[in-house]
Structures are given as C-alpha cells and as structure tokens.
C-alpha cells in the first residue's frame, strides 16, 4: 500500500528536465540573416501559437505571451516524451498538473479582483438573472470559479492517462493474440499504430487546450 501511495505522488523529474531542455536544443535562435528551414518552422510555430492564444488580449494580456508559449511547449513536449518506450509522462500525475494549474489560475484571478473588483464580481451574476435565483446563481458561479484549476488538471490527467492505458491494453492484447492467428495480430498491431498516432495528436491538443483555457481566464480578468 505504501508503495502504491509513493508511486501516485512520484514525479519523474528526469522527463520534465528533458522537456525543459529540448526547446533550447531543438529550437535554436537565429544568429544569421539567412535562416534555414528549421528556424523558419520554429518561427512559424511560435507565431501560430501566439495568434491562437493572444489574439483576444489587450496590451496587459500580451505580457503573458512568453508564459503561455513556454507552457504550451513544455506540456506538449512532456506529453510527447511520455510516449517513448520505457518512459513515463509526468502529466499523468494529478499532483504535477495541479502544481501548474493552481498558480497560473491564481495569477489570472487575483489581479482581476484586485484592480477590477466590480467587473470581476459582476461575472458571478449573469445579467438578467431572476431575483429569486440570484443567491443560488452566485453560489454556483463561485464554485465554478474555484474549481477551475481542478478541472484544468483533471482534464489533462484524464486524457493523457486514458490514451496511455488504451495503448497499453491494446499492446497487451496484441502479444496475447500473437499465438492464435496471424490475421488477428495484424489487426491489433495496426490498431496500436493508429492509437499511437491518435495519442500523438492528443498530446499536442491537450497542451494547446490547457494554455488556451489559461488565456481565456486571463482575458476574463484582465
């Protein structure tokens, strides 16, 4: 039982350090007037992320651009590294995702309540709410606001864990059925390949969704 608990709270620091170091290795900064294809792809990717995440923000919100781009690259690379054989995805640990979600959510909400108190409080009561529903709506909206970091972390954890578990179960079935019939192993092997491709897409999409929701929370309170 103690080993199970320690495994649940175990944080694979090595994978996270690789995810932090990979952008510096794979995405070099341009130091010459004529750039190569790799640097062009790098610049296009960063511009695409900035366009998707920051198009709704004002000048104050744009100060978060470096944070949001770094967050997207970090989560995306961490998810991709977790798909390597004999590796482990830190984003399958709820504690890791909560350690990212709670500070980022706090950083978007606290400035809103500090500098735009009336506007932030107005979000707790939608316009046109009937009088008899006001107390209930305020409670519901407050709970909805407070559980946002939890839903952020749980969404990322659930999606990454589900994908890895599905690949593991299908791979185990492939090995088990390999001695039965050649056609069966072919079908299951193709299924594993397709699931792996799907999980590669999910790894990048979940990184984008996590950063996008933080961006929307920031826009709501900026």
UniProtKB/Swiss-Prot annotation:
InterPro entries attached to this UniProt entry: ATP_synth_F0_asu (IPR000568), ATP_synth_F0_asu_AS (IPR023011), ATP_synth_F0_asu_bact/mt (IPR045083), F0_ATP_A_sf (IPR035908)
Protein name: ATP synthase F(0) complex subunit a
Annotated GO biological process: proton motive force-driven ATP synthesis; proton motive force-driven mitochondrial ATP synthesis; proton transmembrane transport
SUPFAM superfamilies from the UniProt entry: F1F0 ATP synthase subunit A
Keyword set, alphabetical order: ATP synthesis, CF(0), Hydrogen ion transport, Ion transport, Membrane, Mitochondrion, Mitochondrion inner membrane, Transmembrane, Transmembrane helix, Transport
Function: Subunit a, of the mitochondrial membrane ATP synthase complex (F(1)F(0) ATP synthase or Complex V) that produces ATP from ADP in the presence of a proton gradient across the membrane which is generated by electron transport complexes of the respiratory chain. ATP synthase complex consist of a soluble F(1) head domain - the catalytic core - and a membrane F(1) domain - the membrane proton channel. These two domains are linked by a central stalk rotating inside the F(1) region and a stationary peripheral stalk.
Top-level taxon of the source organism: Eukaryota
Gene that produces this protein: MT-ATP6
Lineage: Eukaryota, Metazoa, Chordata, Craniata, Vertebrata
Recorded catalytic activity of this chain's protein: H(+)(in) = H(+)(out)
């Amino acid at each position: 039982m103690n080993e199970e608990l320690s495994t649940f709270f175990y944080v694979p620091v090595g994978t996270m350090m690789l995810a932090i170091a990979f952008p510096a290795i794979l995405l070099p900064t341009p130091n010459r007037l004529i750039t190569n294809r790799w640097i062009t792809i790098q610049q296009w990717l960063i511009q695409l992320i900035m366009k998707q995440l920051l198009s709704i923000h004002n000048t104050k919100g744009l100060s978060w651009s470096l944070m949001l781009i770094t967050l997207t690259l970090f989560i995306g690379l961490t998810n991709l590294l977790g798909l390597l054989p004999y590796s482990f995805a830190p984003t399958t640990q709820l504690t890791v995702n909560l350690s990212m979600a709670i500070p980022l959510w706090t950083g978007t909400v606290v400035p809103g309540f500090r500098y735009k108190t009336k506007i932030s409080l107005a979000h707790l009561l939608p316009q046109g709410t009937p009088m008899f529903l006001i107390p209930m709506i305020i409670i519901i909206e407050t709970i909805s606001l407070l559980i946002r970091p939890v839903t952020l972390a749980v969404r990322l954890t659930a999606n990454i864990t589900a994908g890895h578990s599905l690949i593991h179960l299908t791979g185990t079935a492939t090995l088990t059925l390999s001695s039965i019939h050649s056609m069966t192993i072919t079908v299951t092997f193709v299924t594993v390949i397709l699931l792996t491709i799907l999980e590669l897409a999910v790894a990048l999409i979940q990184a984008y969704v996590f950063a996008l929701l933080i961006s929307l929370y920031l826009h709501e309170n900026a």
